[in-house]
């Protein structure tokens, strides 16, 4: 569905980063666990990481900036952008803490699969969607937590400015710099691109895709969300390969048809099993419609790659009756999910998204992803593809044993797909659902076959 573009809030066809949603005014934290090399002091490690971080900010200066709101006024919330770090403020250097006595050893942490990692134990401020309370507000921070046998490196970025793809790319850049290398000129140009020009808005009067569902309704039509909690599941490479094979089974194999990706397949699997669990529990009826909202990386549509660190995510929605989801094959669900994702990942769609956001004077009216009913809907984002790249490492610290998104405030109905770190190929599935739903999901035969939770081993490949 399309409409005609209206004059944007800005006086030209450009505006800053597209992630202008109030809920994104917070931090995404990632933590990597590394061994401390023999005969290498903690002070030396701090100095090495600080040196690399300083060089990264020399080559990509806006990473040293603060996050600010500009152009606010009556009826206008303004928009979020970056500005130089105030000279009167303390420098935004690497911080560190020693927690040998208060935290498990590295070996214990690895054996537990990272189950001890929580935001409140690692950094002095929360992650999304909680208010951060930082003034000034840094674009990025690095914190080191030393434990017996190793160090936890916490890399955090402000989510209005840097998305998950950009955050993962920063791990690569830190490793390159710690190893004595340099960021390529092409990557530096991309990272420093004028973000207000990368995504030109659509001229007034031209057709634009309709994104009006991103405006918060008044009055709010849903009851308060149920109490939810995060739970981590793991999927081994054989399981993901089998699910991907099932998602491609019987689908169109013409050269022009794109096969289901691992993300498509895993999204279809989670949506199907959660819907089947909810249907079996009697909490929903088969004719109720469920929405799966997916975060879409808009870089390729705009001729960009992961070296463009700024936020470039939008959303797509797939809606189906719950009984249809539960009864469909993974191939059928994956095909529909892929079709909707491809429709969202076009230049016109991404530019329409930016044009719509620029035209909303009061950004507090924006609702990230639109209305989500936690009783029926799910939403997911993924950095799973990072597992196909070289393992995450940091110079003298070597390979990352595990990488995690530390546990924070619940986001009902949210799913994260992430690599686990190291070379195992294990994928993390982080789900936020009511406890009774998580417990029921763990008893679902399909879910039990393919996933591991709480130290329980998976069944093994199906013969």
UniProtKB/Swiss-Prot annotation:
Pfam families: TRI-like_N (PF22664)
InterPro entries named in the record: CAT-like_dom_sf, Tri101-like_N
One example GO MF annotation: acyltransferase activity
Keywords, alphabetical: Acyltransferase, Transferase
Pathway(s): Mycotoxin biosynthesis
Cited function: O-acetyltransferase; part of the satratoxin SC1 cluster involved in the biosynthesis of satratoxins, trichothecene mycotoxins that are associated with human food poisonings. Satratoxins are suggested to be made by products of multiple gene clusters (SC1, SC2 and SC3) that encode 21 proteins in all, including polyketide synthases, acetyltransferases, and other enzymes expected to modify the trichothecene skeleton. SC1 encodes 10 proteins, SAT1 to SAT10.
UniProt-recorded name of the protein: O-acetyltransferase SAT5
Organism placement in taxonomy: Eukaryota, Fungi, Dikarya, Ascomycota, Pezizomycotina
Name of encoding gene: SAT5
């Amino acid at each position: 569905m399309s409409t005609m573009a209206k004059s944007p809030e800005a006086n030209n066809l450009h505006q800053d980063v597209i992630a202008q949603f109030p809920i994104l005014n917070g931090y995404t934290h990632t933590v990597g666990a590394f061994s401390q090399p023999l005969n290498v002091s903690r002070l030396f490690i701090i100095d090495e990481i600080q040196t690399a971080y300083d060089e990264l900010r020399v080559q990509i200066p806006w990473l040293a900036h603060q996050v600010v709101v500009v152009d606010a006024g009556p009826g206008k919330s303004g928009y979020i952008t970056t500005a130089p770090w105030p000279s009167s403020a303390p420098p935004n250097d690497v911080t560190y803490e020693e927690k040998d006595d208060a935290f498990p050893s590295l070996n214990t942490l690895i054996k537990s699969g990272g189950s001890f990692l929580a935001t409140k134990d690692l950094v002095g401020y929360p992650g999304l969607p909680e208010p951060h309370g930082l003034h000034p507000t840094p674009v990025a921070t690095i914190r080191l937590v030393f434990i017996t046998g190793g160090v936890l490196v916490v890399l955090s970025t402000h989510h209005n400015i840097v998305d998950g793809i950009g955050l993962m790319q920063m791990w690569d850049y830190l490793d390159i710099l710690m190893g004595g290398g340099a960021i390529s000129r092409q990557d530096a140009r991309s990272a420093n691109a004028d973000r207000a020009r990368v995504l030109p808005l659509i001229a007034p009067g031209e057709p634009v895709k309709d994104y009006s569902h991103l405006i918060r309704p008044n009055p709010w039509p849903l009851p308060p969300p149920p109490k939810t909690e995060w739970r981590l599941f793991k999927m081994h490479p054989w399981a993901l390969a089998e699910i991907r094979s099932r998602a491609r089974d019987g689908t169109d194999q013409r050269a022009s048809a794109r096969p289901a990706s691992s993300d498509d397949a895993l999204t279809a699997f989670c949506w199907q099993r959660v819907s089947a669990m909810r249907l079996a529990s009697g909490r929903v009826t088969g004719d109720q419609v469920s929405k799966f909202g997916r975060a879409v990386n808009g870089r390729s549509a705009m001729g960009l790659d992961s070296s463009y660190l700024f936020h470039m995510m939008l959303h797509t929605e797939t809606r189906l009756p719950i009984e249809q989801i539960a009864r469909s094959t993974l191939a059928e669900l994956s095909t529909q999910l892929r079709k909707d994702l491809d429709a969202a990942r076009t230049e016109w769609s991404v530019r329409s998204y930016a044009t719509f956001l620029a035209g909303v004077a009061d950004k507090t009216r924006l609702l990230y992803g639109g209305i989500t009913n936690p009783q029926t809907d799910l939403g997911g984002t993924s950095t799973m593809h990072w597992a196909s790249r070289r393992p995450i490492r940091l110079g003298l610290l070597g390979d990352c044993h595990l990488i995690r998104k530390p546990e924070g405030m619940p986001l009902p109905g949210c799913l994260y797909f992430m690599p686990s770190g190291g070379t195992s190929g294990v994928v993390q599935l982080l789900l936020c659902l009511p406890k009774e739903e998580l417990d029921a999901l763990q008893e679902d035969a399909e879910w039990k076959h393919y996933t591991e939770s709480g130290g329980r081993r998976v069944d093994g490949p199906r013969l």
